Each structure stands twice: as C-alpha cells, then as structure tokens.
Amino acid sequence: MAEEKHHHHLFHHKKDDEPATGVDSYGEGVYTSETVTTEVVAGGQDEYERYKKEEKQHKHKQHLGEAGALAAGAFALYEKHEAKKDPENAHRHKITEEIAATAAVGAGGYAFHEHHEKKKDHKSAEESTGEKKHHLFG
C-alpha cells in the first residue's frame, strides 16, 4: 500500500506526474535586460462587478436560509402532530419538535442576515458607479 499513489485532492492534474525539465520553454533560458512595465488600473467597473457578484451570492444564501427555515418549521409541525398521535413516544417527539423549531428560528435569522448583506452590497454597487439615486423621502 505504501507504493501506491494516494491522491488527497478531488482533481488530479497530469502535469504533476511529468518530470521537471531543465530548460524553461517560455524564454528558452535566455536573459535580457529589457524591462516591461504593466500598469493596472482598478476602475469603478471592476468594483461594481464585484459588488454585484457579492449581492448575487448573498441573495442565493438568503434563499437557502429561507428554504431551511421552511423545512425546519414543517418538520417541527410534523413532530408536534406525531406527539399527539403517538402518546407512548410523546416526550421524544416534543423534544425533536423543539429542536426543529430552534433550527427554524436560526435559519430564519440567517436569511435575515443575508438579506441585509445583500442590501448593503446593492448600496455599495450603486455608490461605486458614482451615480446616486435621489430618494426624496428616506
């Protein structure tokens, strides 16, 4: 088993198995004294795109939180019904109901948090473009 290759990563890259060569294929091992300067300008468009991407991610997470709250709430109601239907195991069903209700509240809080993060990113995206909307009452 020691001689087998163990891959701990999800994807295996073929270039890892190739032996390293002594010659650099990009520059063929030749050095020059020429210097190339590249200027990178971080414009407002890149910042705007980043904020919009984050806003989309927060919206997706908000929807996952809402779905989790809905599922946990439905399970809590189911356990409440089972507690009435099965009196022998009513105590176990009541405990499970409380745990599910707590999970529903937590998921709802997470959805609420992501909603506010989404609003914050939306506002930041508007500010990064330099255009402000004129809200008269607020």
Swiss-Prot record:
Tissue expression summary: Expressed in the basal region of leaf sheaths. Highly expressed in stems, and at lower levels in roots, leaf sheaths and panicles.
Keyword Amino-acid biosynthesis among record annotations: no
Annotated GO MF terms: sequence-specific DNA binding
Cellular component, GO annotation: cytoplasm; nucleus
Record has NADP as a keyword: no
Coiled-coil stretches: none
Signals that turn on the gene: Induced by gibberellin (at protein level) in the nucleus. Induced by abscisic acid (at protein level). Induced by aluminum in roots and shoots. Induced by abscisic acid (ABA). Induced by drought and cold stresses in leaves. Induced by cold stress, osmotic shock, salt stress, ABA and ethylene.
Gene Ontology annotations of biological process type: regulation of DNA-templated transcription; response to aluminum ion; response to oxidative stress; response to water deprivation
Compartments it resides in: Nucleus; Cytoplasm
Phenotype reported upon loss of the gene: No visible phenotype under normal growth conditions, but mutant plants are hypersensitive to drought stress, and have decreased sensitivity to abscisic acid-induced germination inhibition and oxidative stress-induced growth inhibition.
Region feature (Disordered): 1-27, 106-138
Ranges of Basic residues composition bias in the record: 1-13
Alphabetized UniProt keyword annotations: Cytoplasm, Nucleus, Stress response
Main location, first listed in the record: nucleus
Highest taxon of source: Eukaryota
Note: Plants silencing ASR5 exhibit delayed flowering, abnormal panicles, reduced seed number, reduced number of trichomes on leaves, palea and lemma, and exhibit sensitivity to aluminum and drought stress. Plants over-expressing ASR5 exhibit enhanced tolerance to salt stress, osmotic shock and drought stress.
Function: May function in gibberellin signaling pathway downstream of GID1 and SLR1. May be involved in the regulation of plant growth in the basal region of leaf sheaths. Involved in tolerance to aluminum. Regulates the expression of different genes that collectively contribute to the protection of the cell in response to aluminum stress. Binds to the promoter and regulates the expression of target genes involved in aluminum stress response. Binds to the promoter of STAR1 gene, which encodes an ABC transporter required for aluminum tolerance. Involved in drought tolerance.
Family: Belongs to the abscisic acid and water stress-induced protein family.
Protein name, as recorded: Abscisic stress-ripening protein 5
Organism (species): Oryza sativa subsp. japonica
Source lineage: Eukaryota, Viridiplantae, Streptophyta, Embryophyta, Tracheophyta
